[in-house]
Design a protein with these regions (language model features):
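Structural signature of the two symmetry-related core transmembrane helices
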Residues: 164-178, 187, 228-229, 396-410
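C-terminal transmembrane bundle
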Residues: 32, 36, 193, 207, ...
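Cytoplasmic loop-to-transmembrane helix junctions
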Residues: 134, 168, 219-226, 452-459
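Cytoplasmic helix-loop-helix junction between adjacent transmembrane helices
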Residues: 125, 183-186, 190-229, 240
Length: 544
């Protein structure tokens, strides 16, 4: 008897499974809010030096632009210096003055344009001028927390269980996200953001895993697709929340405090019976299965399961793999698969988060841009899901990356005045990157053999998190070299798309179990299409 037989006895697609997925849908909708909240909470508004005490600088009198709260912003191009003299002469663009005055740093702080947001971390802690890169540092630390969480909670989940780690992750996001909203200084804020990233990563690793282990094989694709679309739709949810809440502290609270409720709701979901059986806890597994049977109104089926049956299923489940990570690079075929997939994961996340974190660069309403980004991601994922069944994995993976790079590189020569053209190219590029992420998740799971599947997936996940960490640094460099972000975000997907052409096709191909089988497949001449033919096919597809 297999575990699937036990699940059928207690109900594999009943009210319990529906409630389980619905309870995990709500927190999934706020994943994007935590990833991208700094698009709004760390926005840098127009700003200008505060003047010296009254009577010492006449240059702030007259011909000024009114700001909320009775403040006045003089229309000067200078943001990080002010006149030191009293003769009313404005600094030139190069920072120098005429004979009548000199410039000095903004010693009394800044005035900010609060017409869009009443408060951000930038306006509260004066993160402008020399401190301008610090918001990007906070985002990098958050992504570092996501990476750290992936390294820690993957191991902890296998050792302590899906449910325990999921609950701890939800509580960590709730507490640390709330702490970030109540932070009194920037360093404290960064620390809370890093730890909330750790918690969010733990949730990401376990919420799909726990739900999948309670549903039958035939329903797994549907569950994964639904939860994936919910997390993508969270970008639109974030736009709505940010539009309604213009103070960064209240916005941070709005996306964090619901996780206390999610923690209480998810407490109802029992531990995965499959995990309990694998870890030699058949009695608890039996209790959970019978509880599911009661909820699904399959009491007779639950009562028919005995402890001996559960123990017998435990003996039939596969043992944990003892292959080390060196198996990913030990043979030529595995090296090619591992390196290509790591490149794909890194470049996809690098460009995806780089575009997602740079909303003000488009010169349009940031709430509208965020909504467009969320909508195109949903459409792209739907299109990719359908295309994978007809055109295969390799062509879709390579085409989506190369097209993304072409759209982004094509944006470079477009004049800045053509805002809608620039936005359209970026939205299309981001949609291709969303399709690439869907394809890589499926493709990676199929390419790695069972012996190293979890290890290989873990390595590609780490590379994806590294890409997300590097993206804010590229945007900071773009402040000095404006063309650099689009060049990097465009070239990286093209290079990875070409690398994807060297991967074997897995459409309608049985999954392999050992590294030796992977090498045997690579040696069989008829199994692989030459890479140059795949490149030609991809180029033809992009032209179409």
């Amino acid at each position: 008897m297999a575990f699937g037989d036990l699940l059928e006895k207690v109900g594999s697609a009943g009210p319990f499974q529906l409630l389980c997925v619905l309870l995990l849908t709500a927190p999934a909708l706020l994943i994007a809010s935590h990833n991208l909240v700094q698009n709004f909470s760390a926005i840098s508004p127009e700003h200008q030096c505060r003047p010296p005490p009254p009577g010492t600088n006449a240059s702030w009198v007259g011909n000024s632009t009114a700001a909320p709260g009775g403040l006045s912003l003089a229309p000067s191009p200078e943001r990080c210096c002010r006149l030191a003299g009293t003769h009313g002469q404005r600094p030139r663009r190069n920072g120098s003055l005429g004979r009548e005055g000199e410039t000095e740093p903004c010693r009394d702080g800044w005035y900010y344009d609060c017409s869009t947001f009443s408060s951000t971390i930038v306006t509260e802690w004066d993160l402008v001028c020399d401190l301008g890169p610090l918001p990007a540092l906070a985002q990098m630390l958050f992504m570092a927390g996501v990476l750290l969480g992936a390294l820690l909670f993957g191991v902890f989940s296998d050792r302590f269980g899906r449910r325990v780690i999921l609950l701890c992750s939800l509580l960590l996001v709730a507490v640390m996200g709330t702490g970030a909203a109540l932070s009194s200084d920037f360093l404290t804020y960064c620390a809370f953001r890093l730890l909330s990233g750790v918690g969010l990563s733990g949730f990401l690793l376990n919420y799909i895993c726990l739900s999948l282990e309670w549903v039958p094989t035939k329903s797994r694709a549907l569950v994964v697709t639904w939860l994936s679309y919910c997390s993508t739709a969270g970008q639109v949810v974030l736009a709505g929340l940010a539009y309604s809440i213009r103070d960064w502290r209240w916005l941070q609270l709005a996306i964090s405090t619901p996780f206390f409720i999610f923690f209480l709701c998810v407490w109802w979901i029992p531990e995965s019976a499959r995990w309990l059986i694998v870890n030699h806890r058949p009695a608890t597994a039996l209790s959970n299965l019978q509880r599911v049977a009661r909820i699904n109104q399959k009491q007779l089926g639950g009562d028919s399961i005995s402890l001996e049956m559960v123990e017998k299923v435990g003996g039939s489940l596969p043992e944990k793999s003892t292959c080390s990570c060196l198996g990913l690079f030990h043979t030529p075929a595995m090296r090619r698969i591992s390196c290509c997939l790591m490149s794909v994961s890194f470049s996809t996340n690098l460009a995806y988060f780089g575009l997602s974190m740079d909303l003000p660069a488009f010169g349009l309403d940031i709430f509208l841009v965020q909504t467009f980004f969320g909508a195109i991601d949903i459409l792209a994922k739907m299109a990719c899901t359908l295309a994978l069944s007809y055109f295969g994995r390799r062509a879709i993976q390579a085409s989506s990356l190369i097209l993304a790079g072409v759209f982004l590189l094509g944006n470079i020569p477009v004049p800045r005045e053509m805002l809608m053209v620039r936005l359209a190219l970026v939205v299309l590029g981001k949609g291709c990157l969303a399709a690439s992420s869907v394809c890589s998740c499926l493709y990676g799971g199929e390419l790695f053999p069972t012996a190293v599947r979890q290890t290989g997936t873990g390595f590609t996940t780490v590379m994806a998190r590294l890409g997300g960490m590097v993206a804010p640094a590229v945007l900071v460099a773009g402040q000095q070299f404006p063309f650099l972000p689009l060049v990097i975000f465009g070239v990286a997907p093209v290079v990875s798309g070409i690398a994807a052409c060297f991967l074997p096709e897995m459409h309608n191909v049985p999954l392999l179990d050992t590294i030796e089988e992977v090498e045997d497949r690579a040696r069989r001449k008829g199994e692989e299409t030459p890479a140059r033919e795949t490149v030609a096919h991809v180029v033809h597809s992009t032209r179409i």
